[in-house]
């Protein structure tokens, strides 16, 4: 099922987390609290630095977000692994949006660099994935480069984010 839409609201992302957007058994986003975005502001198969597609999403930051209470008490900061997971979530969403069948699983990342942090005083996180390759064979797989920005400043960069869609995940 291909979706002819170039942006998605929070309600639509929640529908995706329930398996309602791309059809049963296909790509899903995680439910809150692990859903790491509030909206997708752009998704395209043609754009991006490599001409293979781009997806841009945003997360509104408020001091009451769950991870600030536990990471770290007295020194609240969003865990970097959540930003990395958000980028994998977006690659999987891109594959489902392209009509790929199966359930998404992160397969790896080539390189990750952290050069900043997300504090409770921040306003907005922006995720951007530039797709490098989409393989549409027995295994539907996407490879992309990503970045995480906080209030307009790039603070994480990831190269070669890999996500695959699988018909059967029982032996994964």
UniProtKB/Swiss-Prot annotation:
Pfam families, per the entry: FabA
Transmembrane helix as UniProt keyword: no
Active-site positions on this chain: 71
EC number of the protein: 4.2.1.59, 5.3.3.14
Any one of the GO BP annotations: unsaturated fatty acid biosynthetic process
Signal peptide: none
Molecular functions (GO terms): (3R)-hydroxyacyl-[acyl-carrier-protein] dehydratase activity; trans-2-decenoyl-acyl-carrier-protein isomerase activity
Keyword Zinc: no
Pathway: Lipid metabolism; fatty acid biosynthesis
Residues annotated as transmembrane: none
Keywords in alphabetical order: Cytoplasm, Fatty acid biosynthesis, Fatty acid metabolism, Isomerase, Lipid biosynthesis, Lipid metabolism, Lyase
One cellular component (GO) term of this entry: cytoplasm
Biological function: Necessary for the introduction of cis unsaturation into fatty acids. Catalyzes the dehydration of (3R)-3-hydroxydecanoyl-ACP to E-(2)-decenoyl-ACP and then its isomerization to Z-(3)-decenoyl-ACP. Can catalyze the dehydratase reaction for beta-hydroxyacyl-ACPs with saturated chain lengths up to 16:0, being most active on intermediate chain length.
Subunit structure: Homodimer.
Name of protein: 3-hydroxydecanoyl-[acyl-carrier-protein] dehydratase
Organism per entry: Pseudoalteromonas atlantica (strain T6c / ATCC BAA-1087)
